[in-house]
C-alpha cells in the first residue's frame, strides 16, 4: 500500500513541504493545484525534485465543477481538463481528483453526470491517465459516497473510479459500512482525515479544522 499526503496539509513552500514529506517517509504526494501554481519551476522540474526525494506525484487535485453541466459549460470544461492532462503528463501524475459539483449552474441529472464523466474518463484513457470522483460533503447534488458510486457505476468506464474521504463521509454522519459493498478495484484512492466534532458550516469545518488521522 502506498502512503501519500496532500501538500495542502502542510505549511511552507512546496519545496519545504516535499522535504518534510520525504523525511516522514511517505511514498508520494497529492499535489494541490495552488501549491503547483505558486511553484517557481516547471512541471518537469517539480517531478524531478520529488523523484530526487524518493516521492511520486500520485494525485492532482482538485478539478471542480465538471459533471452535470449544461452542454456549453461541459464543452468548456473538457478543454480545461485537457490542459490539466498536459500538466499531469509532465508531472508524471496518473490520477486526477474530480470533486462533486457545487456550481449553481449544475443540473441534478445523474444520467448526464455519468455520461459527462464517461467522456472525461475516455479522454484521460487516451493519455493513460485515470479519473477519481469524490463526493464533497457540500456538493450541490452529490454529497454522499453512495451517490458518487452510483454515478461511477452508470458511467461504466475502466479509467473512472471512486475516491473516498473519511471527513466527507463522517462529517455528514453517513454510514461507512456500505463501502464494503463497492468492488475494491473501483476505489482509486482513499483519503483519511480527522476533525473535532463542531457545530458549524461543513465547508469552514473542512477547510479550517481538519486534523491528521487520530488527532480528532
Residue ranges and their predicted role:
Residues 1-3, 55-58:
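Transmembrane beta-strand segments of Gram-negative outer membrane beta-barrel proteins
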Residues 40-54, 82-90, 175-188:
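Short amphipathic alpha-helices and their capping/turn segments at secondary-structure boundaries
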Residues 34, 65, 101, 165, ...:
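Flexible loop residues that form catalytic
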Residues 15-35, 84, 91-94:
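Catalytic domains of carbohydrate-active enzymes, especially glycoside hydrolases
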Residues 28-29, 60, 119-215:
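Acidic/histidine-rich catalytic cores of soluble enzymes
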Residues 1-14:
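Boundary/entry segment of secreted carbohydrate-active catalytic domains
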Residues 30-51, 100-105:
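Glycine-rich, proline-tolerant flexible connector loops at the mouths of alpha/beta enzymes
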Residues 15, 52, 67-162, 171:
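Active-site acidic/histidine proton-transfer and metal-coordination neighborhood
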Amino acid at each position: 500500500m502506498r502512503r501519500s499526503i496532500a501538500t495542502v496539509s502542510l505549511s511552507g513552500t512546496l519545496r519545504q513541504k516535499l522535504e518534510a514529506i520525504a523525511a516522514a517517509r511517505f511514498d508520494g504526494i497529492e499535489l494541490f493545484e495552488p501549491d503547483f501554481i505558486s511553484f517557481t519551476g516547471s512541471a518537469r522540474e517539480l517531478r524531478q525534485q520529488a523523484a530526487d526525494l524518493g516521492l511520486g506525484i500520485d494525485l492532482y487535485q482538485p478539478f471542480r465543477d465538471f459533471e452535470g453541466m449544461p452542454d456549453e459549460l461541459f464543452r468548456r470544461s473538457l478543454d480545461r481538463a485537457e490542459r490539466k492532462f498536459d500538466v499531469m503528463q509532465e508531472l508524471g501524475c496518473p490520477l486526477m481528483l474530480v470533486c462533486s459539483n457545487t456550481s449553481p449552474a449544475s443540473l441534478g441529472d445523474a444520467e448526464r453526470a455519468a455520461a459527462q464523466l464517461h467522456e472525461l474518463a475516455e479522454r484521460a484513457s487516451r493519455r493513460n491517465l485515470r479519473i477519481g470522483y469524490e463526493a464533497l460533503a457540500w456538493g450541490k447534488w452529490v454529497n454522499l459516497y453512495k451517490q458518487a458510486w452510483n454515478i461511477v457505476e452508470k458511467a461504466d468506464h475502466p479509467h473512472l473510479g471512486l475516491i473516498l474521504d473519511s471527513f466527507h463521509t463522517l462529517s455528514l454522519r453517513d454510514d461507512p459500512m456500505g463501502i464494503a459493498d463497492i468492488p475494491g478495484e473501483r476505489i482509486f484512492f482513499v483519503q483519511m482525515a480527522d476533525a473535532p466534532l463542531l457545530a458549524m458550516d461543513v465547508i469552514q469545518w473542512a477547510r479550517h479544522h481538519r486534523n491528521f488521522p487520530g488527532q480528532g
